[in-house]
Design a protein with these regions (language model features):
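Basic, amphipathic alpha-helical segments enriched in Lys/Arg and hydrophobic/aromatic residues
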Residues: 148-215
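Long, low-complexity, polar/charged, intrinsically disordered or flexibly structured peripheral segments
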Residues: 93-138
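A short acidic, amphipathic alpha-helical/loop segment
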Residues: 31-36
Length: 215
């Protein structure tokens, strides 16, 4: 519940544009997805708080459609379809269909021995994001792109921790916003000084540790 008012306050003071929002499962709420994607044009990268016990028929627990003939085969993500006056749709193609360019034209080559459709390109499934904005994410969960983006979040968290560590801000009991902001800035300055000292000492492997440099 705190995300939307917090971001509204942030954007009212900062004219920044962001492409992705990386959050943990605590932000897994329909209102957050709607706010980020529809109101702010930001792609949410948020894991499910818990996988549905009974996934929608034809989909797996991450909202990815499966092959009608073999539910172990996941359909392949093929981008987002955007048309004026219509909801954005996630395009999925047959897992045994290969997208290629021939003579400057996009074509699909189907290699399935038991196709579920007479179409030469195999089954194509367009899923409106608005049908379930929480499950039908613009970047499919557990895809390589989704996982790589989410890894960035853990790197940022470690960086934030190390920025707070020199002044013990991870255990701060301050309630005053201005005082806390001042301590965070001082901590960032301290961390930068550590980096400069470590670099001058040719000891860059310890740039995040004042204790190790002192030793």
């Amino acid at each position: 519940k705190s995300l939307i008012p917090t971001l509204n306050k942030f954007f009212s003071k900062h004219d920044f544009k962001y492409k992705y929002f990386l959050g943990d499962a605590g932000f897994d709420a329909v209102d957050n997805y709607k706010y980020l994607y529809k109101d702010k044009n930001i792609i949410p990268i948020i894991p499910l708080r818990r996988a549905p016990s009974s996934p929608m028929p034809g989909f797996n627990e991450n909202g990815v459609p499966t092959c009608p003939n073999d539910n172990k085969l996941l359909m392949k993500f093929d981008g987002i379809t955007r048309e004026k006056g219509r909801s954005d749709r996630i395009k999925w193609i047959c897992p045994k269909s290969k997208k290629t360019r021939i003579n400057g034209k996009t074509q699909y080559i189907l290699t399935c021995e038991n196709p579920c459709t007479t179409s030469k390109c195999g089954k194509i499934y367009q899923v409106p994001i608005d049908n379930n904005i929480r499950m039908h994410t613009v970047i499919p969960r557990n895809s390589s792109k989704w996982n790589n983006l989410y890894k960035t979040r853990t790197i940022i968290e470690r960086t934030n921790f190390m920025m707070k560590y020199p002044l013990a801000l991870q255990y701060t009991k301050l309630n005053n916003t201005e005082s806390l902001k001042s301590e965070v800035i001082l901590s960032a300055i301290t961390q930068l000084i550590v980096v400069l000292i470590a670099n001058n000492m040719n000891n860059t492997q310890n740039i995040l540790s004042i204790k190790n440099i002192a030793i």
